Regions:
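N-terminal single-pass transmembrane signal-anchor helix
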Residues: 2, 13-49, 53
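Alpha-helix boundary/capping detector
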Residues: 11, 68-69, 87
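Extended amphipathic alpha-helical segments with heptad-repeat/coiled-coil character used for oligomerization
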Residues: 80-83
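Intrinsically disordered, low-complexity regions enriched in Pro/Ser/Thr/Gly and acidic residues
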Residues: 86-196
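Membrane-proximal N-terminal amphipathic helix
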Residues: 49-76
Length: 196
């Protein structure tokens, strides 16, 4: 007698439970193909997440710079070496924060290493972001910024780089930056996300 009942197949007097090896292989192969098809989408979502995080952090820096500039104007502090900003002393250069790790740490409310600077050739770990400042085209840890040329090569203009956990600054283009162009009394900020 042939009969089917909730996964039980009766063949003669022998009862078989479960799936055959062929059925399991087909299901696993199908799942593997679905996973492979979804992988590029998941990787792109990961890249977009880091790019959005950098854009957001860079925008926060822009807002902090506007508040800092307003504080400098109110205090008439253009030529001062330090400006008191939200319970912190921020070292300045030509009226704007210098491009140092300490100055950016004082401006941003993001998880950065407590002091010093990060190694650019080792993946960032221990905080959400890593940072290195006071770089210029002739410095040891300088990383060229795509589509940006330093006007002054002598070291007057300086840059600070901030990159996310898990990335290296030296090898991956996934960071945001702030340039104090003291040679022209201006600043530049932006983000690079090609390597995220």
């Amino acid at each position: 007698m042939w009969g089917y009942c909730l996964g039980l197949v009766e063949i003669g007097n022998v009862k078989s439970k479960g799936f055959t090896l062929m059925e399991i292989t087909i299901v696993l192969t199908t799942l593997a193909f679905i996973a492979l098809a979804a992988l590029p989408v998941l990787l792109d979502i990961h890249r977009q997440t880091y790019a959005a995080m950098l854009h957001s952090s860079q925008s926060s820096l822009g807002t902090a710079l506007k508040f800092f500039h307003a504080q400098s104007v109110i205090d008439n502090a253009y030529d001062q070496e330090h400006v008191h900003y939200i319970d912190r002393q921020v070292k300045t250069r030509k009226g704007m924060p210098e491009a140092s790790a300490d100055s950016i740490r004082a401006l941003l409310e993001i998880d950065l290493p407590a002091r010093g600077y990060s190694k650019i050739d080792v993946p960032c770990k221990g905080s959400d972001f890593c940072i290195i400042g006071q770089q210029h085209p002739n410095s040891a840890h300088f990383v060229a910024i795509p589509d940006y040329q330093f006007l002054d090569k002598s070291g007057v203009d300086r840059v600070v780089y901030i990159w996310p956990q898990g990335y290296t600054l030296a090898e991956e283009a996934c960071y945001f930056y702030y340039v104090n162009q003291a040679s022209t009394d201006s600043i530049v900020r932006g983000h690079v996300t090609q390597g995220c």
